Amino acid sequence: MRTSQFLLATQKETPSDAVVVSHQLMLRAGMIRKLASGLYTWLPMGLRVLRKVEAIVREEMDAAGALEILMPGIQPAELWQESGRWEQYGPELMRLVDRHNREFCLGPTHEEVITDLARNELNSYKQLPINMYQIQTKFRDEIRPRFGLMRGREFVMKDAYSFHADHASLQVTYDRMHLAYSNIFTRLGLKFRPVEADNGSIGGAGSHEFHVLAESGEDDIVFSDGSDYAANIEKAEAVPREKARPAATEELRLIDTPNAKTIAQLVEGFDLPIEKTVKTLVVHAAEEGKLIALIIRGDHELNEIKASQLEQVASPLVMASEAELRDAIGAGAGSLGPLNLPLPCIIDRSVELMSDFSVGANIDDKHYFGVNWERDLPVPTVADLRNVVAGDPSPDGKGTLEIKRGIEVGHIFQLGTKYSEAMKCQVLGENGKPVNLAMGCYGIGVSRVVAAAIEQNSDENGIIWNDTLAPFQIALIPLRYETDAVREATDKLYAELTAAGFEVLLDDRDKKTSPGIKFADMELIGIPHRIVVSDRGLAEGNLEYKSRTESQPQAIAVADVLSFIQGKVNR
């Protein structure tokens, strides 16, 4: 491809509304253009990368035995009402009414549509298992679209759905898809981690997320330094570092604490170790009209996902208001504690192992110091309530936990029979009786993968593509292309490289575009290999080669360039 025949839309300046690196570089490299909030047009440079991601996803899905289909982007409300998600889904679901006053939505996901297809096309266990996928545009009406393609409203997604006669069959396909996803991200050349995850609004049982490691990631992912254990922050089990509770050494005493409304103020004002304090968080209980207290150590954070999954706690999690606290306890949020609290309590595992700690007295501006379990109050229900922190023991007993930032690019779920029961998706089993189909669901954010790859692979000069994802593998830059010798050598090499199957971008812009601008553009775009043809080099029988990841170019004999490039480019 010659730049004279291509839409080379690079920009020198960074748009003011672009915050993350991938958004900045995709705009500057001429990969995308913004149409409206969260909506982007893919330009030729970007689309070449997107299609490469799609091709690898498609190859691995086909190899895993999945069948490609294509479902409508607009879905009838009746299916969502049947599954129960029409009412459950928030304003992210874009709802439409057609000219006949029938309700539809723009599909953010396709569980309902695929389940409807399965119940109409499958009738016997002999047709199972079956796994179907599509690569299609999705729409979610995000309240604050941001970070370019990282969190847009319209995006390209690969979503697959499998159907099974039993859970054992589902597990086999789930494991196969886990391997397929690992193969996909390995082939894409990304540093990634599969982690245990919560199922969220999709529902069901087991689930794993696939995260590309990047400091700009929105998610904290947790993994052991001594084993394969990995989970996202919502799912990671928090194991106390302490093995046993120390013996009590202090007497219980009631202290006036008028200026200690927060843990930080209590610690600073009374010179307390923060690990000797607790937070008492009151939330709505599962029993309507009731409240329950969740208690964690002062230096820990409540894991709202874990808390909302406790049978005693209302889901979604709702914090008690100040008025509710006053009515139920008679004190404000900054003075609450488990001692003499007229509410049921659940304490975190690490709180159970505390001694000589301080708690709110359930009286405004007062705290108890020197509190000890069993002596001063009984140990209530114990549960895992907190987020893990770096250095915690790994739940599998091997090593300690590390935490890194990640960008979620894939998620696989074992849905079980949630949708098949709601929508009566059944086949006749081996015994001739109807069986609700077990389902799996497997998604990859294809367009997000492109952005995540840039977040992981860029420098101050631009994007750093690997040979697999690069829009072009080679940038061929002639200096003084208007001269006969340079033009002849360039055109000959271009023909040889393209005939050998390389993807080459020949920068044939005229002399008004300086060599420095050409070099800067190709670095910005991130093309992995650069060959420069010049009068001086040709006079010495050489061309100049430079890798995107190297600082210095090297001279290559003209006769050796093709074999040299064949050894450099990973195909």
UniProtKB/Swiss-Prot annotation:
Coarse class of the protein's main subcellular location: cytoplasm
GO biological process, one term: prolyl-tRNA aminoacylation
Keyword annotations of the record: Aminoacyl-tRNA synthetase, ATP-binding, Cytoplasm, Ligase, Nucleotide-binding, Protein biosynthesis
Catalytic activity, EC: 6.1.1.15
Assembly: Homodimer.
Superkingdom classification of source: Bacteria
Catalysis performed (reactions): tRNA(Pro) + L-proline + ATP = L-prolyl-tRNA(Pro) + AMP + diphosphate
A Pfam family hit: tRNA_edit
Cellular component terms (Gene Ontology): cytosol
Subcellular location: Cytoplasm
Entries under InterPro entries matching the protein: aa-tRNA-synt_IIb, aa-tRNA-synth_II, aa-tRNA-synth_II/BPL/LPL, Anticodon-bd, Anticodon-bd_dom_sf, Pro-tRNA-ligase_IIa, Pro-tRNA-synth_IIa_bac-type, Pro-tRNA-Synthase_IIa_type1
Species the sequence originates in: Pseudomonas savastanoi pv. phaseolicola (strain 1448A / Race 6)
Record bears the keyword Cytoplasm: yes
Domains: entry comment: Consists of three domains: the N-terminal catalytic domain, the editing domain and the C-terminal anticodon-binding domain.
Single GO MF annotation: proline-tRNA ligase activity
Keyword Acetylation carried by entry: no
Similarity comment: Belongs to the class-II aminoacyl-tRNA synthetase family. ProS type 1 subfamily.
EC main group: ligase
Name of the featured protein: Proline--tRNA ligase
